[in-house]
């Protein structure tokens, strides 16, 4: 879902390596006497994948809405690209429009169907162009939302807990798809999530937001695809500790003949 941007200073869609895609300097957001974001500094480089963790009420959604252009900024120093797109937890498809028309919303070219078809093929839904949204599974709906976002070639892709409502297997498949699309299209990405394992598996850098401030910044140097090995668990324990959650002890490796596979323990509810 592409957002208009009337109040935020924009940078060109193709940012240079020296020019960040996102930059906030001392950004503050209040609701009455409640300070939700408190003097926050944030920079996201072109093509960087950043994950944002934090307890409910820490300011994650407010920050994402600011970057999406949905909330006023009151003349503060916020820089984002013109080309932005958001994928929400709810796919937000229009039920009276077929799948390809949902993807093509807002496109003005004469070849909008061809562009929508290409985007849907890229997310594995080329066979569902003329389907109605009500017939899609949860995973298919989120794939459609991704296609709708990426068909516009955004310089900044904002992901607001897009996998939270999916079952575990579908979520893992969506992780692989998002990484593949990120490598292909090279947008800067900000993923808001409650799932520590998801953040470590996907991001170049993980931030923890606490009381409106960035309390933790962890650069993830593990090779992709990331496995739940000792190094993964070490990063996980550090992040959970800063989130005030006691990490469970790592599970022993399965016996050589065991049919069980070791996976991360999944979402941590904060």
Predicted segments — roles?
Residues 146:
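Hydrophobic anchor residue at the start of the ABC signature
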Residues 53-55:
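The feature captures the beta-strand-to-loop junction immediately N-terminal to the Walker
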Residues 151-155:
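A short, proline-enriched helix->beta-strand linker immediately N-terminal to the Walker B motif
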Residues 68:
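Helix-to-loop junction immediately C-terminal to a conserved catalytic motif
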